[in-house]
Protein backbone atom coordinates (compact mmCIF):
# COMPACT_ATOMS: atom_id res chain seq x y z
CA UNK A 1 0.00 0.00 0.00
CA UNK A 2 1.00 3.62 -0.45
CA UNK A 3 3.01 5.14 2.36
CA UNK A 4 2.11 8.73 1.44
CA UNK A 5 -1.36 10.22 0.95
CA UNK A 6 -2.25 12.13 -2.18
CA UNK A 7 -2.09 15.43 -0.29
CA UNK A 8 1.39 14.60 1.04
CA UNK A 9 2.60 13.71 -2.46
CA UNK A 10 1.10 16.87 -3.95
CA UNK A 11 2.83 18.94 -1.26
CA UNK A 12 6.24 17.47 -2.13
CA UNK A 13 5.61 18.04 -5.83
CA UNK A 14 4.87 21.69 -5.11
CA UNK A 15 7.81 22.07 -2.72
CA UNK A 16 10.53 20.53 -4.90
CA UNK A 17 9.06 21.49 -8.28
CA UNK A 18 10.34 18.45 -10.16
CA UNK A 19 9.42 14.80 -10.73
CA UNK A 20 12.18 12.76 -12.44
CA UNK A 21 10.92 10.08 -14.86
CA UNK A 22 12.83 6.88 -15.50
CA UNK A 23 12.55 3.34 -16.85
CA UNK A 24 15.11 0.61 -17.26
CA UNK A 25 14.74 -3.15 -17.11
CA UNK A 26 17.97 -3.55 -15.09
CA UNK A 27 17.06 -3.45 -11.40
CA UNK A 28 20.60 -2.79 -10.18
CA UNK A 29 21.02 0.08 -12.63
CA UNK A 30 17.69 1.42 -11.46
CA UNK A 31 18.90 1.42 -7.87
CA UNK A 32 21.94 3.47 -8.87
CA UNK A 33 19.75 5.99 -10.69
CA UNK A 34 17.45 6.25 -7.68
CA UNK A 35 20.36 6.76 -5.33
CA UNK A 36 21.94 9.41 -7.58
CA UNK A 37 18.68 11.37 -7.84
CA UNK A 38 18.15 11.08 -4.09
CA UNK A 39 21.65 12.38 -3.36
CA UNK A 40 20.89 15.31 -5.66
CA UNK A 41 17.86 16.21 -3.58
CA UNK A 42 15.01 14.60 -5.55
CA UNK A 43 12.29 13.16 -3.33
CA UNK A 44 10.00 11.87 -6.07
CA UNK A 45 10.51 9.33 -8.82
CA UNK A 46 8.04 8.34 -11.53
CA UNK A 47 8.89 4.86 -12.76
CA UNK A 48 7.49 4.73 -16.29
CA UNK A 49 6.12 1.20 -16.66
CA UNK A 50 6.81 0.66 -20.34
CA UNK A 51 8.60 -2.69 -20.51
CA UNK A 52 7.87 -6.36 -19.95
CA UNK A 53 7.79 -7.35 -16.27
CA UNK A 54 7.95 -3.68 -15.27
CA UNK A 55 5.94 -4.53 -12.16
CA UNK A 56 8.77 -6.76 -10.93
CA UNK A 57 11.34 -4.01 -11.47
CA UNK A 58 9.19 -1.41 -9.69
CA UNK A 59 8.57 -3.72 -6.77
CA UNK A 60 12.29 -4.16 -6.17
CA UNK A 61 13.06 -0.46 -6.63
CA UNK A 62 10.32 0.53 -4.21
CA UNK A 63 11.59 -1.94 -1.61
CA UNK A 64 15.07 -0.47 -2.06
CA UNK A 65 13.79 3.09 -1.66
CA UNK A 66 11.85 2.19 1.49
CA UNK A 67 14.90 0.47 2.94
CA UNK A 68 17.73 2.79 1.90
CA UNK A 69 16.30 6.17 0.82
CA UNK A 70 14.07 7.65 3.55
CA UNK A 71 11.60 10.16 2.18
CA UNK A 72 11.88 9.04 -1.45
CA UNK A 73 8.33 8.84 -2.84
CA UNK A 74 7.95 6.26 -5.60
CA UNK A 75 5.18 6.42 -8.18
CA UNK A 76 4.39 4.83 -11.52
CA UNK A 77 3.70 6.38 -14.92
CA UNK A 78 2.45 5.24 -18.33
CA UNK A 79 -0.55 3.54 -16.70
CA UNK A 80 -3.44 3.03 -19.11
CA UNK A 81 -6.08 1.06 -17.18
CA UNK A 82 -7.46 0.53 -13.68
CA UNK A 83 -6.14 -3.02 -13.39
CA UNK A 84 -2.55 -1.88 -13.86
CA UNK A 85 -3.06 1.01 -11.43
CA UNK A 86 -4.43 -1.37 -8.80
CA UNK A 87 -1.54 -3.79 -9.27
CA UNK A 88 1.10 -1.10 -8.83
CA UNK A 89 -0.70 0.34 -5.80
CA UNK A 90 -0.55 -3.13 -4.26
CA UNK A 91 3.21 -2.88 -4.71
CA UNK A 92 3.30 0.43 -2.86
CA UNK A 93 3.02 3.04 -5.61
CA UNK A 94 2.39 6.42 -3.96
CA UNK A 95 1.11 8.10 -7.11
CA UNK A 96 -0.17 7.06 -10.52
CA UNK A 97 0.48 9.04 -13.71
CA UNK A 98 -1.45 8.38 -16.92
CA UNK A 99 -0.96 9.59 -20.51
CA UNK A 100 -4.68 10.36 -20.84
CA UNK A 101 -7.75 11.02 -18.70
CA UNK A 102 -9.19 7.68 -17.55
CA UNK A 103 -12.10 7.75 -15.15
CA UNK A 104 -11.66 4.08 -14.21
CA UNK A 105 -8.18 4.90 -12.92
CA UNK A 106 -9.52 7.89 -10.99
CA UNK A 107 -11.96 5.65 -9.13
CA UNK A 108 -9.45 3.02 -8.00
CA UNK A 109 -6.92 5.65 -6.92
CA UNK A 110 -9.50 7.73 -5.06
CA UNK A 111 -10.63 4.69 -3.09
CA UNK A 112 -7.14 4.45 -1.64
CA UNK A 113 -6.47 8.20 -1.37
CA UNK A 114 -3.59 7.77 -3.85
CA UNK A 115 -2.65 10.75 -6.03
CA UNK A 116 -3.35 10.27 -9.73
CA UNK A 117 -2.19 12.68 -12.39
CA UNK A 118 -3.98 12.26 -15.74
CA UNK A 119 -2.63 13.53 -19.03
CA UNK A 120 -4.95 16.31 -20.23
CA UNK A 121 -4.86 18.47 -23.34
CA UNK A 122 -7.90 20.71 -23.07
CA UNK A 123 -9.76 22.82 -20.52
CA UNK A 124 -12.69 20.41 -20.76
CA UNK A 125 -10.47 17.47 -19.81
CA UNK A 126 -8.87 19.47 -17.00
CA UNK A 127 -12.28 20.40 -15.60
CA UNK A 128 -13.45 16.78 -15.70
CA UNK A 129 -10.25 15.58 -14.01
CA UNK A 130 -10.72 18.11 -11.22
CA UNK A 131 -14.36 17.08 -10.82
CA UNK A 132 -13.00 13.56 -10.30
CA UNK A 133 -10.71 14.81 -7.52
CA UNK A 134 -7.42 15.32 -9.35
CA UNK A 135 -4.83 17.37 -7.41
CA UNK A 136 -2.14 17.70 -10.10
CA UNK A 137 -2.95 17.80 -13.83
CA UNK A 138 -0.35 16.32 -16.17
CA UNK A 139 -0.02 18.44 -19.32
CA UNK A 140 1.01 15.96 -21.99
CA UNK A 141 2.74 16.27 -24.31
CA UNK A 142 4.08 19.53 -22.91
CA UNK A 143 6.06 20.24 -26.07
CA UNK A 144 2.82 20.45 -28.06
CA UNK A 145 1.09 22.95 -25.76
CA UNK A 146 3.90 25.03 -24.23
CA UNK A 147 3.87 27.60 -21.40
CA UNK A 148 1.32 29.74 -23.23
CA UNK A 149 -1.32 27.05 -22.76
CA UNK A 150 -0.62 26.92 -19.02
CA UNK A 151 -0.88 30.69 -18.70
CA UNK A 152 -4.19 30.68 -20.54
CA UNK A 153 -5.62 28.00 -18.23
CA UNK A 154 -4.38 29.70 -15.06
CA UNK A 155 -6.18 32.92 -16.01
CA UNK A 156 -9.74 31.71 -15.39
CA UNK A 157 -8.63 28.81 -13.15
CA UNK A 158 -5.81 29.93 -10.84
CA UNK A 159 -6.53 26.96 -8.57
CA UNK A 160 -5.49 24.42 -11.21
CA UNK A 161 -2.14 22.74 -10.51
CA UNK A 162 -0.29 21.67 -13.66
CA UNK A 163 2.74 19.44 -14.27
CA UNK A 164 4.01 19.51 -17.87
CA UNK A 165 5.84 16.41 -19.09
CA UNK A 166 7.61 16.36 -22.43
CA UNK A 167 9.20 19.55 -23.70
CA UNK A 168 10.84 20.25 -20.34
CA UNK A 169 14.62 20.51 -20.02
CA UNK A 170 17.27 21.54 -17.50
CA UNK A 171 17.84 24.78 -19.44
CA UNK A 172 17.18 27.91 -17.36
CA UNK A 173 15.16 29.61 -20.07
CA UNK A 174 12.99 26.54 -20.54
CA UNK A 175 12.29 26.14 -16.82
CA UNK A 176 11.69 29.86 -16.33
CA UNK A 177 9.15 29.82 -19.14
CA UNK A 178 7.17 27.03 -17.51
CA UNK A 179 7.28 28.36 -13.94
CA UNK A 180 6.58 31.94 -15.03
CA UNK A 181 3.45 30.55 -16.71
CA UNK A 182 2.33 29.09 -13.39
CA UNK A 183 3.15 25.38 -13.34
CA UNK A 184 3.27 23.65 -9.96
CA UNK A 185 6.07 21.29 -10.96
CA UNK A 186 7.63 19.70 -14.04
CA UNK A 187 8.15 16.10 -15.06
CA UNK A 188 11.54 15.44 -16.61
CA UNK A 189 12.79 12.24 -18.21
CA UNK A 190 15.51 11.91 -20.85
CA UNK A 191 16.50 15.57 -20.53
CA UNK A 192 17.52 14.79 -16.96
CA UNK A 193 18.41 11.10 -17.02
CA UNK A 194 19.88 10.79 -20.50
CA UNK A 195 21.04 7.74 -22.44
CA UNK A 196 24.68 8.81 -22.11
CA UNK A 197 24.36 8.95 -18.33
CA UNK A 198 23.04 5.39 -18.30
CA UNK A 199 25.52 4.08 -20.87
CA UNK A 200 28.51 5.60 -19.06
CA UNK A 201 27.03 4.97 -15.61
CA UNK A 202 27.82 8.57 -14.74
CA UNK A 203 25.86 8.60 -11.51
CA UNK A 204 27.95 11.37 -9.93
CA UNK A 205 27.17 13.52 -12.95
CA UNK A 206 23.48 12.70 -12.58
CA UNK A 207 23.56 13.71 -8.92
CA UNK A 208 25.08 17.06 -9.88
CA UNK A 209 22.54 17.63 -12.65
CA UNK A 210 19.63 16.89 -10.32
CA UNK A 211 21.08 19.13 -7.61
CA UNK A 212 21.71 22.00 -10.02
CA UNK A 213 18.26 21.70 -11.60
CA UNK A 214 16.45 21.68 -8.25
CA UNK A 215 18.47 24.72 -7.15
CA UNK A 216 17.58 26.50 -10.39
CA UNK A 217 13.88 25.74 -9.92
CA UNK A 218 14.04 26.99 -6.34
CA UNK A 219 15.70 30.20 -7.50
CA UNK A 220 13.10 30.79 -10.22
CA UNK A 221 10.22 30.16 -7.82
CA UNK A 222 11.69 32.46 -5.16
CA UNK A 223 11.87 35.34 -7.63
CA UNK A 224 8.23 34.76 -8.60
CA UNK A 225 7.03 34.78 -5.00
What are these regions (language model features)?
Residues 95, 99-145:
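Histidine/lysine/aspartate-rich catalytic loop segments that bind and position anionic ligands
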Residues 17-22, 45-47, 74-77, 96-97, ...:
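Hydrophobic faces of well-ordered beta-strands that scaffold small-molecule active sites
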Residues 41-43, 68, 89-96, 111-117, ...:
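Glycine-enriched alpha-helix->loop->beta-strand junction motifs that scaffold or abut catalytic
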Residues 36-37, 61, 88, 109, ...:
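Generic structural signal for hydrophobic
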Residues 34, 58, 85, 106, ...:
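Generic hydrophobic/aromatic pocket-lining and core-packing "Φ" positions
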Residues 81-91, 124-132, 169-186:
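Catalytic cores of alpha/beta
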Residues 1-83, 87-91, 200-223:
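Conserved N-terminal beta1-alpha1 strand-loop-helix module at the mouth
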Residues 43, 95-105, 139-147, 182-203:
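Glycine-rich phosphate-binding active-site loops on the catalytic face of alpha/beta enzymes
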Amino acid sequence: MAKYSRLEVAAVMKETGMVPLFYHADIELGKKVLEACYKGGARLMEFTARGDFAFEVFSELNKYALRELPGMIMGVGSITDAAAASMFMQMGANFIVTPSLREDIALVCNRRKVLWSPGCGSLTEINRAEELGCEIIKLFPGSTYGPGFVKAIKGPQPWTSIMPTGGVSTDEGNLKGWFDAGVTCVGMGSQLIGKEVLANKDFDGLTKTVKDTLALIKSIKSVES
